[in-house]
Amino acid sequence: MTNDKLTVRYRTIDIVTPVMIAVAFGVIFLGYGAVYSLLKPATSVYLPIEGILSGIWFLPALLAGLIVRKPGAALLSEVLAATVEAALGGPWGAGTLISGVVQALPMELCLLVVAYRKAGPKLVLVAGALTGFAEAIYERISYYPMFRFGDTIVYFVFMIVSGALLGGLVAWGIVRGLAAACLLYTSPSPRDVE
């Protein structure tokens, strides 16, 4: 009889990697938030358009999950990135922390489904799309209660597409590039990203 029990051993690098991703993206988010604010006059014409810009905020969880592939890595990275952004004066304050949790859980769930083993492009695209869906629910309730049904559908579609493309596809491209350059300390190996 085989033991299929998931055994997890954390090394220092398994914690340092999500933290480094988080700090980098916390700073990036501050800059991206400024760009997002500059685009506000254009997106205010039809608010659901803002959803198409959201996938970038999902990157810490997707990257940490792909690189470390251990329970909690995506959550640690996304929540810490949100904390850094909020601490540096991000415009959304404490709501950023709630978003951090909401944005990390779909990646954690997707990795759990594959027992934290091989995480390929399909997994990260699905995780990105699910993250977009989850974040759309949170933002619809918290920030956009005025949306009519049609606006809500458009917003959800934009969030899901953005999560899959700006989140999932970009994360996959970054990890693939890092693996090809042999800059990752562990999984995925270059053969995992072909």
Q: Residue locations for each model-derived region?
A:
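Hydrophobic transmembrane alpha-helices
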Residues: 2-64
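Interfacial aromatic-anchored transmembrane helix boundaries in multi-pass membrane proteins
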Residues: 81-111, 142-143
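Internal alpha-helical transmembrane segments of multi-pass membrane proteins
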Residues: 92-97, 112-133
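Hydrophobic alpha-helical transmembrane segments in multi-pass integral membrane proteins
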Residues: 136-146
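Transmembrane alpha-helical segments of multi-pass membrane transport proteins and ion-pumping complexes
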Residues: 22-30, 34, 58, 66, ...
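Hydrophobic alpha-helical transmembrane segments
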Residues: 15-19, 55, 59, 75-76, ...
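Membrane-helix interface "capping/anchor" motifs
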Residues: 66-75, 114-122
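Single conserved hydrophobic/aromatic residue that forms the stacking wall/gate
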Residues: 185-194
